[in-house]
Design a protein with these regions (language model features):
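Conserved loop->alpha-helix
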Residues: 1-181
C-alpha cells in the first residue's frame, strides 16, 4: 500500500479500518501499518478469525475522480457468511434477513471484493469468479465452511428505507413467492 498515511482508510477483507501507525518500506524491507479494531468490529466481522500471516484482501478507498470498476463499497460489513461451495462457482450462505437485498445480476461484496450475483437464494447467493479474480484475491482459495465478510448493496438499503415511509406498517411485505417486496 504505497503512500499510506496516518488516518487513511484501508479495507481489510472488506472491513474499513483507519491507519493508526505505519512505516514505509525501507531498503527492500517491507513496510507495515496498524489499525485499531473495536469490539463491535470483531463481533460483526471475521477479522477475529485471522492469524498472523493469513492472506487478506487489501484495498484503498476510491477517490471521487477515479473510475469505478464495480459498485459502491463502503467497508461497512453487514454480516459474516459461510462458503458452501468453492470457486469458481462460489456459493455463500448468509443471514436470511439480508437476502432481500440480494438480486440476480445485482452486486454483493464478499471479503471486500465487488461481485455480480449469479443466483439469489433463500439463504444466500452464488457468484461466478473469473480466473483473474480468483487469482488476485483470497476468494480463489476459500474452502467450504470458511467465514467471509459480506456487505450488501447500500443502495438497496436506502431504497427500502425511503419506501418504508409509504408502506402501511413501515416494513416490506412478503410476496407469494417468499421474496421481500
Amino acid at each position: 500500500l504505497d503512500g499510506v498515511q496516518l488516518g487513511d482508510s484501508t479495507a481489510v477483507n472488506g472491513c474499513c479500518l483507519t491507519v493508526v501507525a505505519w512505516e514505509p518500506p525501507v531498503d527492500g524491507a517491507a513496510g507495515w501499518w496498524e489499525a485499531d479494531v473495536s469490539d463491535e468490529t470483531y463481533s460483526r466481522t471475521s477479522l477475529g478469525d485471522l492469524a498472523p500471516g493469513d492472506p487478506v484482501n487489501l484495498e484503498r478507498p476510491v477517490r471521487l475522480m477515479d473510475r469505478l470498476g464495480g459498485h459502491l463499497v463502503q467497508g461497512h460489513v453487514d454480516a459474516v457468511g459461510t462458503i458452501t461451495a468453492p470457486a469458481p462457482d462460489l456459493a455463500v450462505r448468509m443471514d436470511p434477513a439480508l437476502t432481500r437485498y440480494v438480486v440476480e445480476k445485482g452486486s454483493i461484496t464478499v471479503d471486500g471484493v465487488s461481485l455480480t450475483v449469479v443466483g439469489a437464494l433463500d439463504d444466500g447467493f452464488t457468484v461466478a469468479l473469473i480466473p483473474h479474480t480468483a487469482d488476485v484475491t483470497t476468494l480463489g482459495v476459500r474452502k467450504v465452511g470458511d467465514a467471509v465478510n459480506l456487505e450488501v448493496d447500500v443502495t438497496a438499503k436506502y431504497v427500502e428505507r425511503l419506501l418504508a415511509a409509504h408502506l402501511p406498517d413501515g416494513k416490506p411485505t412478503e410476496s407469494p413467492e417468499g421474496n421481500q417486496s
